[in-house]
Amino acid sequence: NGVPYGRYGQPMMMGDMPLWGVSVDDLGYQFDDDQINYEVSAWYGLDERRLSLRSEGSVQTKDEKDIDSLTSLSYWKPLSIFWNGEAGVAYDTKNDKPAIMAGIVGTMPYFIETDARAYLYTDGQVRLDLGAEYEWRLSQHWVVIPEVGLSAFSKDDIDNHITKGFNELETEVRLTYETLGRQLAPYVGVSYETALGSARGQRRQENESVDSSSLTAGVKFWF
């Protein structure tokens, strides 16, 4: 209409303002394995592009207190209404190597949350992580969450107990109680892990168990 914005300038839409967030998707204890598991992510940016920092791993609470973690710094961008893409760099403490990473995260039909991430390490190793979970809401606060994770590698790495192909399957079922506007959710659950393919034979040769189950308890929260 030709009317100037005035001395305060052009108004800024909320979508143009950088925001930030932190999400702790898991901070829990795995009783039979005596370890603390964690999955943390933080982001800063706009609705259409963000910088994302993500770390997941475990800390042994007995013996040598080993720490296994996979940490990535990536550029995040929505690809569609239900899917987001990311690309960046990562570092894996288990094999002590950096990697280039790319992934896609989103919601499949029937509201199944899905993520797929690929890592190319400096030694040429390629790692693929696949994950899925579903929220079965029992009431306003109580939620049952089954989840599954699968990992695969492109070649053998004997030093790090890795074999070519699908290596490990992890599953867990949690009973969660959401409170404080769903920002805080303690849980109890049962987890199960099993080696796959050639990894089963390798573990047997080293007198290690090929599968294990454990009770878990922890909390997830965001702000």
Q: What residue spans do the PLM features occupy?
A:
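Residue-level signature of outer-membrane beta-barrel architecture
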Residues: Y44-L46, Y75-K77, Y91, G106, ...
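Outer-membrane beta-barrel initiation region
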Residues: N1-E64, L73-K77
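Short loop/turn motifs that connect adjacent beta-strands in outer-membrane beta-barrel proteins
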Residues: M12-P18, F31-D34, G45-R50, L79-F82, ...
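Detector for outer-membrane/organellar transmembrane beta-barrel domains
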Residues: K97-D157
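Residues that define the transmembrane beta-barrel architecture of outer-membrane proteins
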Residues: P18-W20, D34-Y38, K65-T71, D96-I100, ...
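Flexible, surface-exposed loop regions and adjacent strand-edge segments
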Residues: V105, E133, I162-N167, R203-V210
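Transmembrane beta-strand segments that form the barrel wall of outer-membrane beta-barrel proteins
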Residues: W20-Q30, R49-T61, T71-L73, F82-T93, ...
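Outer-membrane beta-barrel "beta-signal"
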Residues: V173-T179, S209-F223
